[in-house]
Amino acid sequence: MSDPAPEVASAVPVASPAKAKKEKKPKTDKPKKAKAPRTHPPVSEMVVNAIKTLKERGGSSLQAIKKFLAAQYKVDVDKLAPFIKKYLRGAVTKGELLQTKGKGASGSFKLPAAAKKEKVAKTPKKAAGEKKPQAAAKPKKALEKKKSIAKKPKAATATKVKKPVAKSTKKPAAVKPAAKKAAPKPKAAPKPKAATKPKKEVKPKKVAAKKPAEKKPEAAKKPAAKKA
């Protein structure tokens, strides 16, 4: 008889305790590196300051801006180059900068009429100061309008008063005949005065005395004819 084959024990991998410990270690246990404080202002501020100080008519190029940043802020321009280009593109699209030459981040850049912005900032103050007198002037105009409105009714009343005056002038013209009718009454009153005047005049009496004197001699002549 053949001997039975020996049983082979199956090898089962068992995790070592050392590996388990490594996996359980939290990552937060590592100390974080403290961020170094910035020794320069933001890229946008530096670029705007560079363009302002350079004051180039045709605009400042990217190379000129980099040179200014390296000299003024002592910054590693090669590391900041992508940030500078990104800001230039965004500023052009937003209208914060004008690109006089080139396309994208290459070319020359200029501020959009900084002097005009200052003037515009000053003019709103003046406008605000001017609006106050205008607001004060509006009530004056309103008062003038009210006065004119008040004057118009006065003129209307004056015209209304004038019309009745014209009518009253016409009425006296119609009353004149009534005055003429009343005139004969005073004429009748002076008649007694005229009667007194003939009493004072002696002339009519003298004429009456002469006529009978002439008749008397005629009567004397007639009896003389009878005697013959």
From Swiss-Prot:
Pfam family of the protein (one): Linker_histone
Positions in coiled-coil regions: none
Location of the H15 domain: 39-113
GO BP annotations, alphabetical order: chromosome condensation; negative regulation of DNA recombination; nucleosome assembly
Composition bias, Basic residues: 148-170, 178-209
Principal location listed in the UniProt entry: nucleus
Low complexity biased stretches: 1-18
GO molecular function, one term: nucleosomal DNA binding
Alphabetized UniProt keyword annotations: Chromosome, DNA-binding, Nucleus
Region entry Disordered, spans: 1-44, 98-228
Subcellular location: Nucleus; Chromosome
Compositional bias ranges of the Basic and acidic residues kind: 115-133, 211-221
Cellular component terms (Gene Ontology): nucleosome; nucleus
SUPFAM superfamilies: Winged helix' DNA-binding domain
SMART domains: H15 (SM00526)
UniProt keyword Nucleus, yes or no: yes
Domain of life: Eukaryota
Biological role: Histones H1 are necessary for the condensation of nucleosome chains into higher-order structures.
Family: Belongs to the histone H1/H5 family.
This protein's name: Histone H1-III
Organism of derivation: Glyptotendipes barbipes
